């Protein structure tokens, strides 16, 4: 889902 993508993005950023 989109929430998962946001979590991964926050990890990278």
Swiss-Prot record:
Disulfide links within the chain: none
Leucine amide modification, residue list: 13
Domain of life according to the entry: Eukaryota
Entry's localization field: Secreted; Target cell membrane
Keywords of the record: Amidation, Antibiotic, Antimicrobial, Fungicide, Membrane, Secreted, Target cell membrane, Target membrane
Tissue: Expressed by the venom gland.
Example of a GO biological process term: defense response to Gram-positive bacterium
A GO CC term assigned to this protein in UniProt: extracellular region
Result of altering residue 1 to L: Slightly reduced activity against Gram-negative bacteria and fungi. Increased hemolytic activity
Family, as annotated: Belongs to the lasioglossin-like family.
Protein role: Antimicrobial peptide with activity against Gram-positive bacteria (B.subtilis, S.aureus and L.monocytogenes) and Gram-negative bacteria (E.coli and P.aeruginosa) (MIC=1.3-35 uM). Also active against fungus C.albicans (MIC=6.3 uM). Has little hemolytic activity. Acts by disrupting membranes and bacterial cell wall structures. Binds to peptidoglycan and lipopolysaccharide (LPS). In the context of inflammation and cancer tests, is weakly cytotoxic to normal cells, induces calcium signaling but does not impact cAMP production.
Designated name of the protein: Macropin
Record organism: Macropis fulvipes
Organism lineage string: Eukaryota, Metazoa, Ecdysozoa, Arthropoda, Hexapoda
């Amino acid at each position: 889902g989109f929430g998962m993508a946001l979590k991964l993005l926050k990890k990278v950023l």
